[in-house]
């Protein structure tokens, strides 16, 4: 009981901190029907600055880090992104009212990373004085791209297999899988895979993050990082949390249009995925000395669902998927649940490792 009590105390204490308070405040304003709005250009500007800040910090740390220290977490991030999509997509598709394509699109967003959630978790750890590897931000694109590409490829394969089954059953023709030049499996060829990778890398979130990482690695941006980005970080994050809270409440209405499976998945997936990330992070801690703060951030990245790079990527690559399903589940439920679960993963890391 003492273990459970310590976890509960940590969680309650974190809910009193500004990061989570602004998120809850935004949800309360939206629930009360407030007309408060933050212009879309302001939101995009805030996200851009936060991503550049995360990227610059990660790039500076990558420049100074041992490659071996980065390799393990990077591989773990890729594996987590792929595993979350495979498990989540096929689990969702088994539930009534959920198509294979919609399930994969939803799992793809949940396997990808939320910039706002990652920024919030960093702010919480910084506020508590908990150390973590500076290159953590560089893991974002590894997990994000792996999840989105896996989801799109599996969804395309599923669509092609369904068409083949229908055509074969009608007796009109029999299509064969493979055999084309450069073709990997049904409905997936190298050109398509290359296109998915390029589109994902060109998305606003990944582009800004990669730019920050590259500048951090090859330039000397410490002066502007410390004088401009670092001081603005917490203030901008508080506004972003307010926006995310209002957006989450507004998106909940979209879930009324789709199967109840998305509601259950949106509530449970962040916790389950975060526990998967915690398990992988704990293994890295014992094998490579990965820090307790790093374990928390890896858990939060696994728990988060993409709210910036993912939705437009899915809209473009899977136009047949239902946006009300995958955006409603991820932004309406997944993002707030992941942010509110930050204290849980902190408490677990403190109990198993010590922060």
Label every PLM stretch briefly:
Residues 30-44, 60-66, 220-234, 251-254:
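Membrane-interface junctions of multi-pass transporters
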Residues 35-36, 248-261, 347-352:
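Juxtamembrane membrane-water interface segments of multi-pass membrane proteins
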Residues 52, 56-82, 253-264, 282:
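Helix-loop-helix hairpins and the membrane-proximal interhelical loops
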């Amino acid at each position: 009981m003492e273990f459970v009590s310590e976890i509960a105390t940590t969680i309650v204490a974190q809910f009193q901190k500004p990061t989570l308070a602004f998120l809850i405040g935004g949800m309360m304003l939206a629930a009360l029907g407030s007309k408060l709005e933050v212009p879309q250009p302001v939101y995009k500007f805030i996200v851009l600055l936060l991503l550049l800040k995360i990227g610059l910090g990660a790039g500076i740390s990558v420049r100074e880090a041992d490659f071996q220290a980065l390799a393990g977490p990077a591989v773990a991030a890729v594996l987590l992104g792929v595993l979350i999509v495979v498990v989540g997509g096929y689990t969702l598709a088994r539930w009534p009212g959920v198509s294979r394509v919609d399930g994969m699109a939803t799992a793809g967003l949940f396997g990808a990373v939320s910039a706002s959630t990652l920024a919030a978790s960093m702010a919480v750890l910084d506020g508590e004085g908990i150390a973590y590897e500076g290159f953590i931000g560089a893991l974002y694109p590894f997990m994000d791209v792996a999840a989105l590409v896996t989801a799109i490829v599996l969804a395309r394969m599923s669509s092609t297999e369904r068409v083949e089954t229908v055509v074969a059953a009608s007796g009109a023709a029999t299509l064969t899988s493979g055999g084309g030049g450069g073709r990997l499996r049904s409905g997936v060829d190298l050109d398509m895979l290359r296109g998915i990778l390029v589109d994902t890398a060109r998305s606003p979130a990944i582009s800004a993050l990669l730019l920050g990482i590259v500048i951090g690695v090859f330039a000397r941006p410490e002066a502007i990082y410390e004088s401009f980005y670092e001081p603005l970080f917490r203030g901008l994050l508080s506004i972003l949390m307010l926006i995310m809270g209002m957006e989450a409440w507004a998106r909940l209405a979209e879930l009324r249009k789709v199967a109840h499976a998305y509601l259950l998945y949106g509530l449970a997936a962040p916790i389950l995925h975060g526990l998967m990330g915690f398990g992988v992070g704990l293994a890295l801690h014992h094998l490579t000395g990965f820090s307790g703060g790093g374990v928390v951030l890896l858990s939060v990245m696994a728990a988060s669902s993409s709210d910036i790079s993912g939705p437009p990527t899915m809209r473009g690559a899977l136009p047949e998927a239902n946006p009300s399903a995958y955006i409603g589940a991820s932004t309406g439920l997944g993002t707030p649940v992941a942010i509110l679960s930050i204290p849980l993963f902190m408490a677990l890391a403190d109990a198993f490792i010590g922060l």
